[in-house]
Amino acid sequence: MIERIEIDPAVMLGKPVIRGTRIPVELILRKLSEGATEADLLDAYPRLTRADIQAALAYAADMLAHEIIVLPSAA
């Protein structure tokens, strides 16, 4: 599923996008967080598929799963 996500410095300044489009993963996540439904996204972006939306969510989850969190030391 992650193969649907593309990172190319020549496309959207290297931000992760849905492969073959200029639709950033961030846009999909932001719209969903603002209350947009999958149907809303599919209507607004005809080139987008349900699998693309799922790939964006999976990509975001993977990025968070591998994030390194540095906690401030207690003084």
Across the structure, where does each feature detected by a protein language model lie?
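Basic, low-complexity segments
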Residues: 1-15
